[in-house]
Amino acid sequence: IDLLVAADGAEALRAAAARQGATPLGQDDLEALRVLAGIARFGADMDPSRLPMEAGLTRAAISFGKGCYTGQEVVLRATVRGHLQRGLVQLEVPPGAAAGTPLTANGQEVGALTSVADTPEGRIALGYLRRAHWKEGERVGAGAGEAVVRKVIVEDGLPG
């Protein structure tokens, strides 16, 4: 949780939380938790070229019952077709893998990493993969090493 408090009360709140066993988290810790939770972040895992469904945001970001909105035609087309060509997945990645690292299979580029974090569970990343590779346990090349799909996050064009 995020707590917002007046500056003059921040130290008292920190001390009270510490007495209850809470520990402060830094930005790297928060990033690791986000990546482990499979939550896409705009500017890292999403940009205007991505469909909300590709990033696993169908239920959180789209109302299929509302009237007109920017991008409605593209979202509707993907929904009617019933499938997407690429989508967000969570992967275990090798040391040295970073955001922007291409993901490959059979010598072909099939995706790229968008966020990478060191976590208690290892080096974990979010990235986009082509549809044929949306399988937990799927192995793809990641730079000089290999990445393994841990979780498929993409929602395949399903109405919310």
Give the location of each predicted region.
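Acidic-enriched, low-complexity/disordered segments with a strong bias for Aspartate over Glutamate
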Residues: D2, D8, D28-D29, D45-D47, ...
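Acidic, low-complexity central loop/insert segments
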Residues: I1-A40
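Short helix-capping and hinge/turn segments at secondary-structure transitions, especially at repeat
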Residues: A18-A22, A40, A44, E73-H83
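Short, conserved active-site entrance elements at the starts or edges of catalytic domains
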Residues: L33-L57
